[in-house]
A protein has these predicted regions:
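Nucleotide/phosphate-binding catalytic cleft detector across ATP-hydrolyzing
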Residues: 2-179, 187-305, 311-356
């Protein structure tokens, strides 16, 4: 499972006949999307996760023709001819390339619901907390242009809390740390809303970049982001492991220019990942300092919950607990928390009188 991979596209389709809206215009679906920097995840009610692909698009820079989207495009990163470029149209949780993002959203909506004609769906999109109004408008416009009938937005930490099984409607403080691919959102939630939050433009992708820098500096070895991600998943840690792990790393020797293989240890990844991990801990500390006393007491009792693909980095749970003195736990399935939370939220929007 991808250790970032943090941020995701989550598509939730309500299969209830009453919502399907069969008619002369085809099938209508209610869809929830987590606009993630690193991956796309598709969740269908009653079926669970049915699609998981990277949020990568490959296109011809001469003609602007899209060549591949998702996993196929990811495999092209670093291996394309000069005229073909594989890019991530989302950076740090927001749209960096509007046109490509719009086409990518449209592609995954169609892939999720099938090729058949369907009425324009209502779509709920997850966005990082504290993004600007301009960035929010860009998300809304791209989603409308991708085929939405109505668009609503929900902050990622709120969706993550719902998906983690936290009852956010109660007057009780809950802290969620959602670590995606491009952003880390730290939030205290009570009575269905965010009380205090901080959005850090550092997450799973930055773990990969830290490993790339370390390999270049310490071993004079140039590696790609896919290799760095593999290192992170297999032996990466931000807390001392009981048993040291190793991995053979292939790259290009910066001195000779020739291919080279070295053996990397988990202790070395601890050194490589120390700075980005400490920045996340510092963000948690900042939010705790701004939290009202009564809610701080709740968090002390209930603990901190980690969600998102970045929460899978070994040792992060222990590091936060050691630095804050507060019990810290990772959600049961951190990578799908936002998917489930988005689905429950859009169900609530369509049926606000439901008990849930």
């Amino acid at each position: 499972m991808e250790a970032r991979a943090a941020g995701y596209f989550l598509v939730l389709i309500d299969r209830k006949e009453i919502r399907m809206g069969f008619g002369i215009f085809g099938v209508s679906a209610d869809i929830g999307i987590d606009l993630g920097t690193a991956s796309i995840l598709v969740y269908i009610k009653g079926k669970g996760v049915v699609l998981k692909e990277p949020s990568v698009v490959a296109f011809d820079r001469n003609t602007n023709e899209i060549k591949a989207i998702g996993e196929e495009a990811r495999l092209m990163i670093g291996r394309t001819p000069g005229n073909i470029v594989a890019v991530r149209p989302l950076r740090q949780g927001v749209i960096s390339d509007y046109t490509i993002t719009e086409k990518m959203i449209r592609y995954f909506i169609q892939k999720a619901v099938g090729k058949r004609t369907f009425r324009k769906p209502r779509i709920c999109v997850c966005v990082p907390s504290q993004i600007t109004e301009v960035e929010r408008k860009a998300v809304e416009d791209a989603t409308y242009n991708a085929g939405a009938r109505e668009v609503s937005l929900i902050e990622e930490p709120v969706a993550a809390a719902i998906g983690a099984g936290i009852d956010i409607a109660k007057p009780c403080g809950n802290m969620v740390v959602d670590i995606g691919g491009g952003t880390t959102d730290v939030a205290v939630i009570s009575l269905g809303g965010t009380v205090v939050s901080e959005s850090l433009k550092l997450a799973g992708d930055d773990f990969d970049e830290a490993i790339v820098r370390y390999m270049r500096k310490k071993h004079n070895l140039l590696i790609g982001e896919r290799t760095a991600e593999e290192i992170k998943i297999k032996i990466g840690t931000c807390y001392k492991r009981a048993d040291e792990l190793t991995i053979d790393v292939r790259g290009r020797n910066l001195v000779t220019g020739l291919p080279r293989i070295i053996t990397l240890t988990s202790d070395e990844t601890l050194e490589a990942l120390r700075e980005p991990a400490n920045q996340i801990v510092e963000s948690v500390h900042n939010v705790l300092e701004k939290t009202p006393p009564e809610l701080s007491a709740d968090i002390s009792d209930r603990g901190i919950v980690l969600t998102g693909g970045g929460a899978l980095l070994h040792g992060l749970e222990q590091l936060i607990e050691e630095k804050t003195g507060i019990s810290t736990m990772t959600a049961e399935d951190p990578m799908t928390c936002v998917a489930v939370g988005t689905g429950r939220y859009i169900e609530f929007l369509n049926n606000p009188t439901a008990e849930e």
